[in-house]
Amino acid sequence: MGTIILYSYLTGNTKSVAEAMASVMPEGTPCVPVKEAPANLGDYDTVFLGFWVDRGTANKEAAKLIETLTNKHIVFFATLGMYADSDHARESIEKASALLPNKESLVDGFVCQGKIDPKVIEMMYKMFPPGSAHGQSPERDALHKAAETHPDEQDFANAKEFAKSVLAKLQG
């Protein structure tokens, strides 16, 4: 029984974080998109599942899979436009974990800031008035500017360290 890395992505952020994590996994560890997940997921002790945050939780494709995971160890990693150390980031992992059939199977979670699709920014600015939580403001513009460079090399290094520490914890 081994480990598999699954990821759902929209802009490529989560895919690139998954690939960084895969580079420190034991040789032969599968790393595939959620839509290509093998039917025999129960054959794996540990599932690393990556998703992009949508409305404060895992995106729909990943959420559907999370609801079915009964593996012994589940590890989440997520990308979002907000800062990785924000309350929103932490709460996104918590909300995704609430979807698990067995909440005790969640080992840990990692969050990385990622660039935001410009179409999403445009849509948000049209939907929400300036100054509102999701509307245009100097703070929101600064957040989007900061997100443009992520994930970056430091994020990938952090993702690799996270993956190594989780594997060590599970083996120890």
Question: What residues fall within each predicted segment?
Answer:
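A structure-centric signal for secondary-structure junctions around beta-strands
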Residues: 1-2, 106
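N-terminal beta1-alpha1 ligand-phosphate binding loop
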Residues: 2-24
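A general marker of short, structured functional hotspots
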Residues: 3-5, 40, 158
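FMN-binding flavodoxin-like domain, especially the glycine-rich phosphate-binding loop
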Residues: 24-32, 44-49, 54-172
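Short amphipathic alpha-helix with an adjacent loop that forms part of the alpha/beta core around
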Residues: 37-43
